[in-house]
Amino acid sequence: MREFIVDEARAWIKTPYRHQGRVKGVGVDCAGLPICVARNLGLVGYEFDVSGYGRVPDGASLVAACDKWMTRIDLPELGSVIVVRFRPE
């Protein structure tokens, strides 16, 4: 299954950034990519999504959504989702 996840994610490579986008080839953002990959592989339904978030991360919403729908692991594996937290300079 992990190989299918990677293959589907790679199919989105040329999709431009679009805030809250969810359409391959049209636009997607960093939250939408894992959502759409999982949805396209039949791993989740449309309830597995978030919306209404701002362009500037608040530092908690994305982490809370990931904790709700995913299981944390110590070391990343093929197909893992990595969450990066930015700090204002």
PLM feature spans:
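Generic hydrophobic/packing signal
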Residues: Q20, L41, S80-I82
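Active-site nucleophile-His-acid catalytic modules used for acyl/amide transfer and hydrolysis
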Residues: V6-G27, E47-F48
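A broad structural signal for alpha-helix termini and local helix breaks/kinks
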Residues: I13, L41-G42
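...with weaker cross-activation on analogous glycine-rich loops/strands in unrelated enzymes
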Residues: E3-V6, Y46-E89
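Surface-exposed loop/turn and secondary-structure junction residues enriched for glycine/proline
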Residues: T15-P16, Q20, A31, Y53-V56, ...
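Active-site nucleophilic cysteine motif
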Residues: R22-L41
